[in-house]
Amino acid sequence: MTKALVVYGTRYGATANTSEAIADVLRKEGFEVRVVNAKEDKVQSISEYELIIVGSGIKMGRWTKEPEKFLEKFQKELAKKKLALFVCCGAAHPLTEEEEKTREMEDARRKYLEEKAAKYDLNPVALGLFGGVYDFNKMSWFFRKTMSAVKPKLEEAGFKETEAGLYDTRDLNAIRSWAKEVAKMVDSQT
C-alpha cells in the first residue's frame, strides 16, 4: 500500500477541509494517508512516505508559515519524493472582469506554486490552485474592513453566504478530480 502524507497550514479552515477531501480520495484509491496540520503536529521524518502533498492557505499574498517551514526543513528529501503542492486562495476565483480572470489565475499559479517549488528546488508532480473561504467572522477588524468591498463582488460572482459572514469559493469536485489525478500519476510511476 502506497503511503501518503498530506501536510497543510490553514487560517480559516479551508485548507484543512481541502486536505481531508484530498486524503479521502487517496484512501479510496488505495493509499494509506496521514493528514497533518503543520501548526499542531511537527513531522519528524518523511522517509516512510512515497507521496507528499503540501498545502497552504494564502492571505495577503503569503503562504502560512508552518508548511513553508516544512518545505525548508525537508527540502533535500522532498526533491527525491513524489510531491504535490496546492493552495487555497481567492485568486483561484478572481472577482474581476472575465478577460482578467485567466491572467490573475495564471499569476497566482506562478507566484504561489511554481515560484514556491523553485525556491526550494523542487519538481512537483502536480500543482493545485483551489478557491478559499472568506470567513468575515474570524478576520481581524482591520482585515474585515479592508475586505468589505469583496462581499458584493463575491455575491455578483455567484458565491452566497453558506453561514453568516462565510463565503466558500472552493469547487470540491475539482479538488477531488485533482487528487484522483495525483493518485494516478503516482501509481503509474511506482
PLM features: residue spans?
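A short glycine-rich beta-strand->turn/loop micro-motif centered on a GG-aromatic cluster
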Residues: 32-42
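Short, well-ordered alpha-helical microsegments
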Residues: 42-43, 63
